[in-house]
Amino acid sequence: MFGDINTSKTVCILSVYLNREEIKKTYLQPFGLDEDAFMALSLYQDPKTKKTSKAVLKEYTETELIPVLKEQNISYVLCTDAEYFKVLAGVMKVDTNVGYVLPCAYDPNIHVAYAPSYKSVFYDPDKAKPKIETAMHSLANHLEGKYKAPGDNIVKFAEYPNTLQTISDWLDKLIAMDCPLTCDIEAFSLKHHTAGIGSITFCWNESEGIAFLVDYIPIEGATEAPFGTKGYNKEVRALLANFFRRMQHKIIYHNIAYDAYVLIYQLFMKNIIDTTGLLDGIKIMLTKWECTKLISYLATNSCAGNDLSLKTQAQEFAGNWAQDDIKDICKIEPSKLLAYNLIDGLSTWFVHNKHYPTMVAEQQLDIYEGLFKSTTVDIIQMQLTGMPLNMARVIEVKAILQQDFDSAVKRISDCVLVQEYAYQRKLAWITKRNAELKKKRVDMADADAELLKPKNTVAWNPNSYPQLQELLYDVIGLPVIEYTDNKQPAVDGDTIAKLKNHTTDSRVLVLLEAFIDYTAVNKILTGFIPAMENAALGPDGWHYLFGNFNLGGTVSGRL
């Protein structure tokens, strides 16, 4: 309890850690909130596991937490644990819901808000403090009847031209405005040669802009997905190419290495090996530009890491404007797609206005204008150039690797140790099922039948880390010499190779060698060969493998 213990409480703070002074210092005192209205409860954590399961969280919430909240006549809950918040609010994500006060999934008379734990202020203050501030202001406003959800009324002017003439007129108006613009596209895929341009937006400030369809063709009368199909709008593409040629001011993107990369190919290149069009597009699109993803990286980078996505960087401004990330724009109604696209453009302005001054104040402007911008041009050119592949050789090498893979699988399957382990797994399944069943009994025949099902928990799977751990360390009895970041016994290829030095058993040595071969070949067959097989065919008869580089990540410039 806080304040007068005899006063009825309106708000309950839920926390895994209960420290009265830390809670007051973090959530109450900085915002001038009445302590008499608050109480706090600790949240149950399963002592047997590192992370409490969702099933346990739900059971505790339903049987213990909600009854107590009702008994205390609590109207608001400030939850400082992300997993409990998901259960209480009935949402899938936490960060996109910061600043929202949502009805409780178990009782609509209780409202729930999320704020990071006070402990996070110690190890990640730059991210935790703004989120706590946003959450507490929203909660206070809701208590006073002045609540406005994040993203409400951010659009002051929006136009969605839908004819060739109105699109042309608006592009002329944008040129006449003689000011910087933000630009964002929605496309059909992540690869430049299949992306097309579904829709595009241009915004001239944080609250005004336009958006229009390009290659997205609405399906007339559609009442369920798909709502559109992919086309090729030659006329609108020509207008866009001409617009970018005429544009004299900076255009601001969030992740220019995607948007401009797609636009260069779709508007200026005839095919995937059109180097003349590529260089022309680079000259047009990459002369005057800004990238708020790079700006955000330089303004917010810390040892604790940062999420550079537009949704995260602009969440306090636009809220949760898309419940799910768009994976297939044809499943989005055209009006919603355009509204979503427009808010992306407005949000890009917000992120620019928020982080650009910080980047300058942190003395990062020189590296941004120099190294980062010049590297970005190189990255986009590399992404559009690709690497030529001899597909006949790819097919040939795949067959060789498959032989090696099959050999490794056979050696593993033929090993008596593995056969015994697989048998023990079936026995364990039989024991577990019979303990669950009231009358019916299962036997080895049922276990064998279970093995035939596509998804089952009986089959021996060499790709399963828990099974490998059990086989190598529990069944065979090899020593644990390496651990994963999660403090689990390591079973990666390098560790398995080292384990050869810790046994003289010929059966174990043969098995370890088979695992080493299996791991190496499987990685190439599943990770590299499929990408090569899907390489794009160029007009010269060669296939081209294209990749993407991430500048502004933990490992910058990594393919």
What do these predicted regions represent?
Residues 73-76, 246-251, 457-459:
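Short active-site oxyanion
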Residues 25, 89-126, 203-207, 257-332, ...:
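Metal-dependent phosphoesterase core characteristic of DEDDh/y 3'-5' exonuclease domains
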Residues 83-85, 258, 467:
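Alpha-helix capping/helix-boundary segments
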Residues 144-225, 281-282, 305, 316-317, ...:
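Conserved "right-hand" nucleotidyltransferase catalytic core of DNA-directed polymerases
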Residues 71-72, 242-248, 450-452:
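Short, surface-exposed connector motifs at secondary-structure boundaries
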Residues 60-64, 131-138, 166-169, 235-239, ...:
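Well-ordered alpha-helical segments embedded in enzymatic catalytic cores
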Residues 1-149:
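A polyanion-binding, active-site-adjacent surface
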